Amino acid sequence: MKLLEQIEKWAAETPDQTAFVWRDAKITYKQLKEDSDALAHWISSEYPDDRSPIMVYGHMQPEMIINFLGCVKAGHAYIPVDLSIPADRVQRIAENSGAKLLLSATAVTVTDLPVRIVSEDNLKDIFFTHKGNTPNPEHAVKGDENFYIIYTSGSTGNPKGVQITYNCLVSFTKWAVEDFNLQTGQVFLNQAPFSFDLSVMDIYPSLVTGGTLWAIDKDMIARPKDLFASLEQSDIQVWTSTPSFAEMCLMEASFSESMLPNMKTFLFCGEVLPNEVARKLIERFPKATIMNTYGPTEATVAVTGIHVTEEVLDQYKSLPVGYCKSDCRLLIMKEDGTIAPDGEKGEIVIVGPSVSVGYLGSPELTEKAFTMIDGERAYKTGDAGYVENGLLFYNGRLDFQIKLHGYRMELEEIEHHLRACSYVEGAVIVPIKKGEKYDYLLAVVVPGEHSFEKEFKLTSAIKKELNERLPNYMIPRKFMYQSSIPMTPNGKVDRKKLLSEVTA
């Protein structure tokens, strides 16, 4: 697959097809090509001998997509920076990346950045004055050159720049289109901010198939009335989101086939897909295919997938995350560095062309997490799991296991069983510390329909069900009830915010 050529094909074949929609703003494939060409021409003329990455700042504006393509056509990787990212973190990204330029789709609120800033108005001038100019195709990003760099959280407090090459992205996009049976001209949900690599799961599969990206922003998500009004207008056929976001949508009774009658495919990544969420989606969207996938940012979005059916749900209490894409392989490594046999738990290691070339400007971190196995790049994920008959089962983060009163336990396992209880719509387990040790587990629960007059009676009923599924030491000591679970801008459960709320 020639990625950029495939996207540009639609500018010639279906120039008036909408490529991207956000609120009242939209762009066609013709506009996408013309404006990204103009921008690439300007970048090449301003920085003829430079290949430093370019920061792209904004939220869900159509100009974000134009800027991404303009950067790579000029031979520069782009760094998506969402406006929700704190100023200090943006500053660190600018310093770590060595970027010299920032393209902005909206007003930049961060001051004293060590980069040249091109404002929204400046961009419009560039699109106009350089219209009709085409960049030299030889300059475009290719092969093992970086296509994008996404910054993720680092344990040291400094963000890590994950470098994803052109070849990495082509490998992912080709697999996604083929394995998920994506068709030409479909409407894709774009829920994840561009600084979160889940967004890559919809951007490039949509653009290479001549589809339309339907973007929803954080303000819509905060106002359910606006969110569902937008979804009703969208005619989305391919849904890409975290399971948490879908779970939130399922709390609205009208979120069903009647709202989105042409829904074909649900693609989930970024979190564990709870069985209960998958069951509800099958009930509400009986004609749609539900795909559960797995992969870290360092391995280009996702490397495994499985079609979740009623049979799969009946067979497994916790859903498997799928079979590995054909050009990669999975190894399960034991603590002693040997490969675990089928069915035995260990650390998930991903090998193959999806694997990043490492963290930008961080050789020590790169050496710790990445290695070479049989001449191919490999990434040590820090995730626990096992493989049975080629099927990968995810068992949470190795560092997400806690020891409570001498017992080692997986918080995600407890959450799985808690969500399966009657009267529970959503739930998160928060481990509470006393000094340096964990003291007890707190369950934060969004209750479903019930007739209990007192909270303690509801808690007793939930605990009774949990006792049938979990040993006593894994039952949360305390329960807290809320109307919703806080989420990060990326659509994942905001565990830090929850912890600060419950310990305040």
UniProtKB/Swiss-Prot annotation:
ATP binds at residues 152-153, 292-297, 383, 394-397, 492. D-alanine binds at residues 197, 301, 492. GO terms for biological process: lipoteichoic acid biosynthetic process. InterPro entries: AA_adenyl_dom, AMP-bd_C, AMP-bd_C_sf, AMP-binding_CS, AMP-dep_synth/lig_dom, ANL_N_sf, DltA, DltA-like. One of its GO terms (cellular component) is cytoplasm. Keywords: ATP-binding, Cytoplasm, Ligase, Nucleotide-binding. Pathway: Cell wall biogenesis; lipoteichoic acid biosynthesis. GO terms for molecular function: ATP binding; D-alanine [D-alanyl carrier protein] ligase activity. It comes from the Bacteria. It is found in: Cytoplasm. Pfam families: AMP-binding, AMP-binding_C. It catalyses: holo-[D-alanyl-carrier protein] + D-alanine + ATP = D-alanyl-[D-alanyl-carrier protein] + AMP + diphosphate. Its EC number is 6.2.1.54. Belongs to the ATP-dependent AMP-binding enzyme family. DltA subfamily. Catalyzes the first step in the D-alanylation of lipoteichoic acid (LTA), the activation of D-alanine and its transfer onto the D-alanyl carrier protein (Dcp) DltC. In an ATP-dependent two-step reaction, forms a high energy D-alanyl-AMP intermediate, followed by transfer of the D-alanyl residue as a thiol ester to the phosphopantheinyl prosthetic group of the Dcp. D-alanylation of LTA plays an important role in modulating the properties of the cell wall in Gram-positive bacteria, influencing the net charge of the cell wall. This is D-alanine--D-alanyl carrier protein ligase. It comes from Bacillus cereus (strain ATCC 14579 / DSM 31 / CCUG 7414 / JCM 2152 / NBRC 15305 / NCIMB 9373 / NCTC 2599 / NRRL B-3711). The lineage of its organism: Bacteria, Bacillati, Bacillota, Bacilli, Bacillales.
